[in-house]
Amino acid sequence: MTKAAELRQKDVAGLEAEVKSLQKAHFGLRMQKATQQLGNTNTLRTTRRDIARAKTILAEKQAAK
């Protein structure tokens, strides 16, 4: 789980990279769930919320410019 304070310290490029890596991880988890290989389905929820948290902070930084 990524903390909001950690994300706020990153610049816009770093946040965009973070969102992309989280989206790739979320896609992999969804594929594991579809093939019934995912044991802990709670990771889908936490990854989805991490993506939303990163996108929110990214939007805040872009609006501040």
UniProtKB/Swiss-Prot annotation:
InterPro entries in the cross-refs: Ribosomal_protein_uL29, Ribosomal_uL29, Ribosomal_uL29_CS, Ribosomal_uL29_sf
SUPFAM superfamilies, alphabetized: Ribosomal protein L29 (L29p) (SSF46561)
Any Pfam family hit: Ribosomal_L29
PROSITE patterns for this protein: RIBOSOMAL_L29 (PS00579)
Keywords on record: Ribonucleoprotein, Ribosomal protein
Family, per entry: Belongs to the universal ribosomal protein uL29 family.
Protein name as it appears in the record: Large ribosomal subunit protein uL29
Taxonomic lineage: Bacteria, Pseudomonadati, Pseudomonadota, Betaproteobacteria, Burkholderiales
